[in-house]
Amino acid sequence: PLRVKYPNQTIYISYREILEYTLSHSDNNTCDWLIDFVGGIKHVDSYIKSLGITYLNLTETEHSMHEDIMRSYNNWSTPLSVARLLQKIFTEHILTNEHFIFLEEAMLKCSSGKDKLIAGLPADIKFGHKTGHSDRTSDGIRICEADAGVIYLPNGEKCYIAVLIKDSRESDQNNVQIMADIAALVYHSLKKGLTD
């Protein structure tokens, strides 16, 4: 999205705007800029693991995965690890209050993935999330379709959810419908629990 807005130009933008493009608009270029800024992908991987999130591996950037799609397999996680990372961010004060508010607002303003998890939730339910997906291999396999976020329940509680679809031969429409269906089932179960 940033390259579309500023084609073939030298630009100067704030880190705040770079973060907004990365979080709210899923911009791969700004994601890689941020990775470089904090010391590289190995540093990001080490930091997340230092938080106690162990079932993940990050060795590739967006650029390296676009150069060779098979490198996408080097980056992996479990849905539980992604959801636990979100839970830690929201409950353990990993970020300063100012940075947490910024992150939460950026996730609530996410413009991508309107047909993913959020599509399975009632329109009046707040949902902050971050989406992603890989390219397809030459065999038509979508290595990853992802959405992870926070459902704000009517009673004030939060539900942390992550859905990662791996090696799918399904159409993009079917993949996102699976995600929406999962979100609907989770919300229905949570709502039932609130009324029992």
Where do the protein language model's features map onto the residues?
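Structured C-terminal helix/loop/strand segments within mature extracytoplasmic catalytic/sensor domains
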Residues: D36-F37, I41, R84-K116, G120-I125, ...
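Catalytic-loop motifs flanking and including active-site residues across diverse enzymes
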Residues: I18, S26, T30, T78-S81, ...
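Mid-domain, small-residue-enriched loop/turn segments at the edges of structured enzyme/sensor domains
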Residues: I11, L19, D32-I94
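Secretory-pathway/luminal and periplasmic proteins that interact with or process carbohydrate-rich
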Residues: P1-V4, N28-C31, Y55-T59, S112-L117
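Structured, acidic catalytic/metal-binding patches in enzyme active sites
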Residues: T10, H25-S26
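Active-site-proximal loop and beta-strand segments within enzyme catalytic domains
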Residues: P1-R16
